[in-house]
Design a protein with these regions (language model features):
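Amphipathic alpha-helical interface segments
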Residues: 1-146, 172-250
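Histidine-centered, metal-coordinating catalytic motifs and their short helical/loop contexts
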Residues: 141-168
Length: 250
C-alpha cells in the first residue's frame, strides 16, 4: 500500500472508534443527569445535601445537559467530512469486503498469530448482505428522524448558538421533549455500535438488541449477582447513586 493511503479497514476502525466514544459520551451525560434527579427525588437526606451545594450541582447538571446535546449533534451531523454516524455506515456499505471471512481470518491471525482455531472459527462467520446494511441504514435513519424532529433545534438554538432570546422560547422547545424517547435514542446508539463491532470483530450477524433503558430497570440490573458486564448507562446509574449516597444522613 502506498504511503499515506489509508486502507478501508483502517478507515472503518477509525470511524467505529469515534462512534464508540461519542455514543458512550451521550449515555454518560444523559444517565448522570436522569440518575441524579431520580436519586434525589427518592431520598430527603440526599436532597438536603444537594441543596446545601446547589451552585455546584446546578453547574454539573447544566454541563451534563449541554454536553449531551453537543455530542448528539456530532453523531447526527450531515457534514460528510466529519466523524459521524453517516460516515461510519458509508464506510461499511461501500467496503463490504472488510466483512468477508477472509478479511476476518486475517484480522484474527494478526491478533493471535500461530493459532490453528481461526480457520474453523471463520467458517461459521456471518457475511453481511446488502439487506443487512440497508436494515442498519433504516435503523439509523429512524433515529435521525427522532433527533431532528425535536432535539436538533434545541442543540442549535439553545446550546450551540444563542438563537433563543427568551426563557419562554427555550421552555417551549424543551416542552416537546420526552425523557423516555431520549433514553431510547441514546441507548440505541450504543446498540448500533455493538452490532457493528460484533460483525467486524467476531463475524456475528448484526442484530440490534433492546436493552433496559430506564433508571429503575438499570438499577435492577445493577443489583443482580451474576457476572454480567454492565453497559455504560448501567455503570453511570450505579456510580451516580453511589456518589449521592454520601449525602444520605438518614
Amino acid at each position: 500500500m502506498l504511503a499515506g493511503v489509508v486502507s478501508p479497514e483502517a478507515r472503518f476502525e477509525r470511524e467505529l472508534e469515534h462512534f464508540r466514544h461519542d455514543s458512550n459520551a451521550a449515555a454518560q451525560f444523559l444517565y448522570a443527569w436522569v440518575s441524579f434527579h431520580a436519586c434525589a427525588n427518592e431520598n430527603k437526606g440526599i436532597r438536603r445535601g444537594v441543596n446545601e451545594r446547589a451552585l455546584f450541582w446546578n453547574t454539573a447538571l447544566g454541563a451534563f445537559q449541554t454536553s449531551l446535546f453537543i455530542v448528539l449533534g456530532r453523531i447526527f451531523d450531515r457534514n460528510h467530512q466529519n466523524h459521524t454516524l453517516d460516515r461510519l455506515l458509508r464506510e461499511a456499505t461501500q467496503n463490504p469486503s472488510i466483512f468477508s471471512r477472509r478479511a476476518l481470518a486475517q484480522r484474527k491471525s494478526r491478533q493471535s498469530p500461530g493459532t490453528n482455531w481461526i480457520k474453523d472459527y471463520v467458517q461459521d462467520a456471518y457475511v453481511p448482505s446488502r439487506k443487512d446494511f440497508a436494515r442498519l441504514q433504516r435503523f439509523a435513519s429512524g433515529k435521525r428522524k427522532v433527533y431532528e424532529r425535536v432535539y436538533q433545534k434545541i442543540r442549535h438554538k439553545v446550546f450551540a448558538h444563542s438563537g433563543i432570546s427568551s426563557r419562554t422560547q427555550s421552555d417551549a422547545l424543551f416542552a416537546k421533549t420526552n425523557i423516555r424517547e431520549l433514553e431510547r435514542l441514546v441507548v440505541s446508539l450504543g446498540q448500533l455500535y455493538e452490532a457493528l463491532w460484533q460483525l467486524y470483530v467476531n463475524g456475528r450477524k448484526p442484530v440490534i438488541q433492546r436493552p433496559a433503558y430506564t433508571v429503575a430497570a438499570l438499577r435492577r440490573l445493577g443489583r443482580r449477582r451474576d457476572r454480567h458486564i454492565p453497559s455504560i448507562q448501567e455503570a453511570m446509574v450505579n456510580e451516580t447513586y453511589a456518589v449521592l449516597a454520601l449525602y444520605d444522613q438518614s
